[in-house]
């Protein structure tokens, strides 16, 4: 019998990381943790190291590494604790690693995700921002290295499952008319427009269907999450923005669909649980038990669909425009959104200001070509600076 596959989980203490480790624990004969990384929840990271006994753990700073190393050593755990961004890249690209779960939220996850790609790993991509920011640069690295890139977002995973194996030959060539990207509409789908300016971070984070981290919950509430996913879908499946249509589906049972020229629409359905796409990507092309309960169609009862309202969700419009513009526009969109969401979560701005900040950044900053990681990160820094200037002028 072959040895278990070794996985580095980047962002192990987040919701995606924890779901990944749940699947690992269900299949100890197939998978083992090689490296676990965490940013701020270091007590949780310690508990995960005690349970999974990885070869490495990675934390942001040296002081935290020394403290965690001491705690683990006292418990008889031989995990070696590293720190810093270079260590993240090292555990993502180590020769011993078979697959990498890229689940660090936001731009911070780009260097380590790209390191895994350049090392030719099986990359389970949960960090959509990495692909949104670097686009062609990222996909060229995938082709050059021979990495296997498998999407973890439930929507892109559903699209991947609904497309023919030869979709890389071109969507039109394999008979695809369009991709239907589903969205729940979030917690404010029916909130009166005049009330959106006064909603709280707690309300924005109360997603009706999914259990997610705070940043992605706010992105779902604004539908920026869907805008980022539209950009991601274009890169993953070599689609034009006009070939991707966003459909609001409040039940989150259909995770996305593919519309074919013969009139067929193929969809992937399931309970809203991230262990389904995670286990699919880990085992692909096989399927394994994920721990997710079977879908009860009788309990679902009905499936509803709506067009998104751009007045209610201006972030979706801004993301679509950035997708059409290309170049550094998606990286700047993402950076401005990260700054704005952080300010909203800290109660410095209103929910409705998120789109205002993003639009201000996109209007002020010139779009440039991005042909290197340095250029991507430079665009990210410029956008964050302009967003910060807006906060200085307007935030309470």
From Swiss-Prot:
Mn(2+) binds at residues 153, 155, 229. NADPH binds at residues 13-16, 127, 129, 213. GO terms for biological process: isopentenyl diphosphate biosynthetic process, methylerythritol 4-phosphate pathway involved in terpenoid biosynthetic process. The keyword Membrane does not apply. SUPFAM superfamilies: 1-deoxy-D-xylulose-5-phosphate reductoisomerase, C-terminal domain, Glyceraldehyde-3-phosphate dehydrogenase-like, C-terminal domain, NAD(P)-binding Rossmann-fold domains. The lineage of its organism: Bacteria, Pseudomonadati, Pseudomonadota, Gammaproteobacteria, Pseudomonadales. 1-deoxy-D-xylulose 5-phosphate binds at residues 128, 154-155, 184, 207, 220, 225-226, 229. Pfam families: DXP_redisom_C (PF08436), DXP_reductoisom (PF02670), DXPR_C (PF13288). It catalyses: 2-C-methyl-D-erythritol 4-phosphate + NADP(+) = 1-deoxy-D-xylulose 5-phosphate + NADPH + H(+). Catalyzes the NADPH-dependent rearrangement and reduction of 1-deoxy-D-xylulose-5-phosphate (DXP) to 2-C-methyl-D-erythritol 4-phosphate (MEP). Its cofactor is Mg(2+); Mn(2+). Belongs to the DXR family. Pathway: Isoprenoid biosynthesis; isopentenyl diphosphate biosynthesis via DXP pathway; isopentenyl diphosphate from 1-deoxy-D-xylulose 5-phosphate: step 1/6. The keyword Zinc does not apply. NCBIfam families: Dxr, PRK05447.1-1, PRK12464.1. This is 1-deoxy-D-xylulose 5-phosphate reductoisomerase. Its EC number is 1.1.1.267. Inhibited by fosmidomycin and 3-(N-acetyl-N-hydroxyamino)-propylphosphonic acid (FR-900098). It comes from Pseudomonas aeruginosa (strain ATCC 15692 / DSM 22644 / CIP 104116 / JCM 14847 / LMG 12228 / 1C / PRS 101 / PAO1). It is an enzyme of class 1 (oxidoreductase). Gene3D superfamilies: 1.10.1740.10, NAD(P)-binding Rossmann-like Domain. GO terms for molecular function: 1-deoxy-D-xylulose-5-phosphate reductoisomerase activity; manganese ion binding; NADPH binding. Keywords: Isoprene biosynthesis, Manganese, Metal-binding, NADP, Oxidoreductase.
